[in-house]
Swiss-Prot record:
Entries under Pfam families matching the protein: Anoctamin, Anoctamin_N
Lineage: Eukaryota, Fungi, Dikarya, Ascomycota, Taphrinomycotina
Highest taxon listed in the record's lineage: Eukaryota
A GO cellular component annotation in the UniProt record: membrane
Transmembrane segments: 182-202, 208-228, 286-306, 321-341, 379-399, 430-450, 499-519, 557-577, 587-607
Protein name: Uncharacterized protein C691.05c
InterPro entries, alphabetized: Anoctamin, Anoctamin_N_fung, Anoctamin_TM
The keyword Transmembrane belongs to this UniProt entry's keyword annotation: yes
A GO MF term: chloride channel activity
Cellular compartment(s): Membrane
Length: 668
């Protein structure tokens, strides 16, 4: 009888491993690992989660978590009820959950993850990686579904054809955040495709630095933003995520000032005054922006001056090689700066005390975008507004004269009259559209794999001789789990950043080279393909997240479009004329930019009124509550977890003994 019971329990735990919802990775090297495992298993099993413990990597243990079906139905019903009351879900029939088959993969994982990691004040377990009392937890992640990933990788090109079913399947598997990103990528690709025709017309039929071409690009940018907002609203309404941010769970790191009762849901919600968050953000961000901005501007300016000197003034040996030094040195100097900046930015964002993970990521991405903005556009601004108009003045007087008096006076400084390089701005712009994008593309794909390879083969040599014998029925799943645990976590910032920066290159500098949209179109296709590859092969499966927009990236699109209405006409003014700029040129360019900027606001108002975003009708809260009260839903009672409560603890002890045995052998 005992043998049959043990066999049945092993079968149940194998089912948990092979059909788990989440994997919790625990640091096996920690002295408090056993206490963490015991507390974790006890908390999970008391909350209707089935668990199984298995050896992970050389230094970590896996806790496989699967939610009980009856409890999942209850979680889904409660979540959909809240969504209906807040307006995110508009169909009352969808509130009812008859079986687990009514719950797609992304909703299932999101509900389980929110229940486990959410704050205890919001009726969750408060199990957060790296936070006490679960500091030994390394990460919590779901497993990829190989069948879906293989199919997605095979038919990725359907995203380029605007296939809505493909987006719906992505939403069902990865959640609305990922689906909305690919929807935006596809929409941007379509927009750039349209702009490419205007670029061809401008290149072959309009004169260089044409005002007409600049006006066309400005119109395209404004229409693109509004059309995307319309499309975005349609998708979020279709996926029932409108106004879903009001339901977002608080992070465990959030420190509320008080608690307030939610009038709709009737639950206590943690509260922290928005004005205090703004004050904290201002105090933290202003010094960061000023100091980092000055340092970065100084580095870019020095690299720019040295580049002009070596490429256009220096006439010594190995000029073709020496002229490449500024770019190499600049990259070397900015790498540590970027690393330090990202660490400081993340710590300052934590001090802002953001309530939700979405708010935290939005604030952090704002800090990072400032740095990417300067790295991407400052060189073009310097060439457009400093080198082009004034190089014939400051290069002979400040570079040639002073350098000729230094150790370069042996004849390496050209003494002939300096001539402005008319192709410098165009060449720099084409570099950012081609070489820089190729480097970025290779970096996105190659660097993570290189890091994983180095860690696996050189940096993480086994320090223990682990003797692990996996159960045959679990071998495939455990192999996948160990492989995916080594992957990096998905960061949506870099995905949006590439497209938004590309948008900026188009709407701010297109008159420099009208064929730029064609290069951007090729980059779009490559980025979409690389995104699919990274999702399926290179990163951990992201925990599904509900979002109702791509904010704050839509605001950055508007910012770049507004700046473009200043830069494009002023660049056309400086470079369309063959006469040299006069003393009043900068003033005239500023006036042109100011007038264009005012026209941009009028244009945005006009487009918004002609192509408005359809407002979703929300029934009053009391009416929604009344509708729910009239409707009766049959929810099955939550039964006990069908596994022995001692099985997981026994597995934890057995797994820990494997690591302890290996540790003892190593010390002998």
């Amino acid at each position: 009888m005992n043998e049959k019971l043990q066999s049945y329990e092993k079968q149940l735990t194998s089912d948990i491993v092979n059909n788990c919802d989440l994997i919790i990775e625990v640091n096996a090297s920690s002295k408090t690992c056993q206490e963490t495992l015991s507390s974790l298993l006890r908390e999970l099993q008391l909350s209707h989660f089935s668990t199984a413990v298995r050896p992970g990597s050389d230094t970590s243990i896996f806790v496989f978590v699967k939610v009980q079906n009856d409890y999942l139905i209850e979680l889904a019903h409660n979540d959909r009820t809240s969504s209906f009351l807040c307006g995110a879900l508009d169909d009352l029939n969808h509130v009812n959950v008859n079986s687990v088959t009514d719950i797609d993969s992304s909703e299932r994982i999101r509900l389980v993850y929110d229940k486990i990691t959410g704050s205890k004040t919001e009726d969750s377990l408060g199990i957060c990686p790296g936070e006490n009392p679960y500091a030994d937890i390394i990460s919590i992640f779901p497993l990829h579904q190989p069948k879906f990933d293989i199919k997605w990788s095979k038919y990725w090109y359907q995203l380029l054809l605007g296939n809505k079913k493909q987006l719906d399947s992505i939403n069902a598997e990865y959640g609305s955040q990922v689906a909305l990103y690919f929807a935006f990528a596809d929409f941007f690709k379509t927009g750039v495709f349209v702009l490419s025709f205007w670029g061809i017309l401008g290149y072959y039929f309009l004169r260089p630095y044409s005002y007409i071409f600049a006006i066309g690009v400005a119109l395209w940018g404004a229409f693109f933003i509004q059309f995307w907002r319309v499309q975005e609203h349609k998708l979020t309404n279709h996926w029932s995520t409108v106004n879903c941010q009001s339901l977002a769970k608080s992070m465990t790191e959030f420190k509320p000032q008080s608690y307030r009762v939610d009038s709709l849901l009737g639950t206590a919600r943690p509260y922290y005054p928005q004005w205090e968050i703004i004050v904290r953000s201002t105090i933290a961000n202003v010094p960061l922006f000023l100091i980092s901005g000055c340092i970065l501007l100084f580095l870019i300016a020095i690299a720019f001056i040295v580049d002009v000197t070596l490429s256009e003034v220096y006439s010594g040996p190995l000029k073709s090689i020496v002229s490449l030094l500024p770019a190499v040195v600049f990259q070397v100097l900015t790498l540590p700066f970027t690393f330090i900046y990202s660490i400081v930015a993340e710590r300052l964002t934590k001090l802002e005390n953001r309530r939700t993970k979405t708010d935290f990521q939005a604030s952090l991405s704002g800090k990072m975008f400032l740095q990417n903005f300067m790295l991407s556009y400052t060189a073009l601004f310097l060439i457009s507004y400093i080198y082009g108009p004034f190089a014939e003045y400051f290069v002979p007087h400040y570079i040639q004269n002073r350098m000729s008096q230094s150790f370069f006076s042996v004849g390496y400084i050209a003494k002939s009259t300096f001539k402005l390089n008319p192709l410098r701005l165009r060449n720099q712009y084409i570099y950012f559209l081609t070489n820089a994008q190729v480097i970025n593309y290779i970096t996105i794909l190659a660097v993570p794999q290189l890091i994983s390879y180095v860690k696996k083969h050189y940096m993480s040599k086994p320090t223990r001789e682990l003797h692990i014998q996996d159960i045959p029925s679990e071998t495939v799943t455990l192999k996948r789990a160990r492989s995916e645990a080594e992957k990096i976590e998905y960061d949506c910032y870099n995905d949006y950043k590439d497209f938004v920066l590309m948008f900026g290159f188009l709407v701010m500098f297109s008159p420099i080279y009208p064929l730029a949209p064609i290069f951007s179109l090729v980059n779009c296709v490559l980025y979409i393909r690389s995104s699919v590859y990274r999702f399926t092969k290179m990163v951990k499966k992201p925990v599904p997240c509900r979002v109702d927009s791509i904010a704050p990236w839509d605001q950055r699109l508007s910012l770049l479009s507004w700046l473009g209405c200043i830069t494009m006409p002023s660049i056309c003014y400086f470079y369309s004329s063959t006469t040299k700029p006069s003393d009043k040129s900068m003033v005239i360019a500023a006036v042109i930019g100011l007038l264009s900027e005012h026209l941009w606001f009028l244009l945005r108002m006009f487009i918004s009124s002609v192509f408005p975003v359809d407002k979703t009708f929300f029934a009053p809260a009391k009416e929604r509550q009344h509708l729910l009260a009239e409707r009766s839903f049959s929810i099955p009672p939550v039964a006990d977890v069908p596994t022995s409560t001692t099985t997981a603890f026994e597995e934890a002890d057995e797994t820990l003994s494997i690591y302890r045995t290996a540790e003892n052998k190593k010390t002998k």
